[in-house]
Amino acid sequence: MLLLVDAGNTRIKWVLVDCSSGQQTPGSWHVAGSAARAETAQLAQAWSSFSISRVLLSNVAGAELREELERAVLHAAGDIELEWFASTPAAGGVRNHYLNPAQLGSDRFAAAIGAHVLFPNRPLVVATCGTATTIDAVNADGAFVGGMILPGLALMASALANNTAQLPEVALHASSTQPFADNTDAAIVSGCLAAQAGAIERAVKAHAAAHPQGELYCILAGGAADLIAPHLSIAYKRVDNLVLIGLHTVAIHTLPTC
């Protein structure tokens, strides 16, 4: 079994791919799971019942989580080599045009790879809406152009509560559809949703202007995507597990038989 792990700031998502099933298709796996950041101890138990022969991980949540993941894999699979995915000048069919390719977050690069393998030969805007919202442009030929980073929906709302005297912490929900709210809680939600949707729409407009001959797809992913999606005035394609699809693509490119 091939274990793929997407360790983010809030949740750890993982899948297991059956390497004996012949030709691999990115995004097709045997079993999937997730755990909250504070629940990493449960991962070893979840993985222990499988025969894991290869592990590919993306971690953007720091050294402490990396050590916890190493311990979980050791407990579940023994002393096997861990492959830590990092951004390089090229991988999985995507070329990284960052000035310093290694500086690009591994999750953003993997998401771009996943989007490109799912929707090849067309320009893409990849919006991943999590703790942070990242909005990246990929050309039809697989060139990662660059992107935007802004606070995620929940982080944006909590920043108002934490840094102002009179604005409350609010529960984010999808029922706030009016742009001009008649109460403070709804006004915060409306403003944060408008900022997120507006950034995505601006990115799509800019990338589409650079590629007038190609049909651009906006790919929407991440835990807050379903809250933001109804407020977009543009067409989009909702995709789950984009980072894991990208990792699966890289694994296939480097060793097709796992």
Curated annotation (Swiss-Prot):
Its cofactor is NH4(+); K(+). The gene is coaX. One of its GO terms (molecular function) is ATP binding. Keywords: ATP-binding, Coenzyme A biosynthesis, Cytoplasm, Kinase, Nucleotide-binding, Potassium, Transferase. Pathway: Cofactor biosynthesis; coenzyme A biosynthesis; CoA from (R)-pantothenate: step 1/5. It comes from Herminiimonas arsenicoxydans. A monovalent cation. Ammonium or potassium. HAMAP family: Pantothen_kinase_3. This is Type III pantothenate kinase. Catalyzes the phosphorylation of pantothenate (Pan), the first step in CoA biosynthesis.
